[in-house]
């Protein structure tokens, strides 16, 4: 049995694979979503003044899952209902709609809880 080799479509004058192209689009959209007001508002709602010994840290944020407090760099704003995949033009409308959602689909979550949730979401939605 001979397997036919799948020929992948190339973009950008043959320098980018199809998956690389959609990865670039996904990354650009996620970057822009950081300034989406519901995302910044969600983070603000979980913030309090830091009272520990680190003089450089001014605030800390509460994880909605484990309920512990974390510095800014250890917290993420998570989509409760996963955003989904972006692998083709057909995925684009749903991906954008889910990514740029309102605050009722957002929560602050620490890095370790986020990792666990993301792995569960990938298993569930594959």
Q: Where do the protein language model's features map onto the residues?
A:
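Long, contiguous alpha-helical scaffold regions
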Residues: 63, 125-126
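Cysteine-rich micro-motifs
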Residues: 105-113
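Short, charged surface segments at domain edges that flank catalytic/cofactor-binding sites
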Residues: 4-65, 93-104
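Cys/His-coordinated zinc-binding microdomains
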Residues: 67, 114
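Short flanking/linker segments adjacent to small metal-binding domains or redox-active Cys/His motifs
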Residues: 116-124
């Amino acid at each position: 049995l001979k397997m036919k080799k799948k020929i992948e479509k190339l973009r950008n004058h043959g320098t980018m694979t199809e998956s690389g192209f959609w990865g670039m689009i996904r990354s650009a959209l996620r970057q822009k979503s950081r300034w989406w007001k519901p995302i910044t508002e969600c983070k603000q709602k979980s913030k309090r003044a830091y009272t520990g010994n680190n003089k450089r840290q001014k605030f800390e944020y509460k994880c909605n899952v484990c309920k512990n407090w974390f510095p800014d760099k250890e917290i993420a704003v998570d989509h409760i209902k996963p955003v989904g995949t972006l692998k083709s033009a057909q995925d684009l409308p749903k991906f954008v709609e889910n990514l740029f959602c309102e605050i009722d689909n957002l929560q602050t979550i620490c890095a370790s809880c986020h990792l666990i949730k993301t792995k569960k979401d990938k298993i569930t939605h594959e």
